[in-house]
Curated annotation (Swiss-Prot):
Keywords: Cell inner membrane, Cell membrane, Ion transport, Membrane, NAD, Sodium, Sodium transport, Translocase, Transmembrane, Transmembrane helix, Transport, Ubiquinone. InterPro entries: NqrD (IPR011292), NqrDE/RnfAE (IPR003667). Pfam families: Rnf-Nqr. This is Na(+)-translocating NADH-quinone reductase subunit D. NCBIfam families: nqrD, PRK09292.1, PRK12405.1. GO terms for cellular component: plasma membrane. The lineage of its organism: Bacteria, Pseudomonadati, Pseudomonadota, Gammaproteobacteria, Vibrionales. It comes from Vibrio alginolyticus.
Length: 210
């Protein structure tokens, strides 16, 4: 397999074939919390992709110099440093979105996807493949966030990116927003529905019966 094919596989595989949320069921908590709007889902996608990619790259660079007994501490220190950078940039340039994301930016530090890729991939791989793996898993995470955020904002408020798409009753239109779509349980059911659709398209992901 050529290097270009390897790059393509590393980036695209986590979207459907090995999605960190839909297949591995990681990072679900933040997916429930930040998907009421497409805007916050998109920014969270960028934040997680940035942190996952650069933490993978950094961990891989020094992997041969990290004592096994403190490797998790080192990984968390690197991830925490990157999260602080992201948090400060959001507060400086996207303050309103930063307030909406609240503590969930800080909780990227303990996100299972970020920690999992650093431990399972970056500790065993070269820097560039680790960087690409981080980008791919960030995009896989973002695919679920943006898909769920699309439906929650559209049917919950009749808007996308804050712009009215469905004519609202309050403005003389026909659509009455469904407030249930803005509650966390709706995201839980939408993620479940998305997992169901993916496993229909990818039957090899269905767990074998015991």
């Amino acid at each position: 397999m050529s290097s270009a094919q390897n790059v393509k596989k590393s980036i695209l595989a986590p979207v459907l074939d090995n999605n960190p949320i839909a297949l591995q069921v990681l990072g679900v908590c933040s997916a429930l919390a930040v998907t009421t709007k497409l805007e916050t889902a998109f920014v969270m996608t960028l934040a997680v992709t940035f942190v996952t990619a650069l933490s993978n790259f950094s961990v891989s660079l020094i992997r041969n110099h990290i004592p096994n007994s403190v490797r998790i501490i080192v990984q968390m220190a690197i991830i925490a440093s990157l999260v602080i950078v992201v948090d400060q940039v959001l507060k400086a340039y996207l303050y309103d979105i930063s307030k909406q994301l609240s503590v969930f930016v800080g909780l990227i530090i303990t996100n299972c996807i970020v920690m999992g890729r650093a431990e399972a991939f970056a500790m065993k791989s070269a820097p560039v493949p680790s960087l690409i793996d981080g980008i791919g898993n960030g995009l896989g995470y973002g695919f679920v966030l943006i898909t769920v955020g699309f439906f929650r904002e559209l049917f919950g408020s009749g808007k996308l990116f804050g712009l009215e798409v469905l004519p609202l009753v309050s403005n003389g239109g026909w659509y009455q927003p469904n407030g249930l779509m803005l509650l966390a349980p709706s995201a839980f059911f939408l993620i479940g529905f998305l997992i169901w659709v993916i496993r229909i398209l990818k039957p090899e992901q269905v767990e074998a019966k015991e």
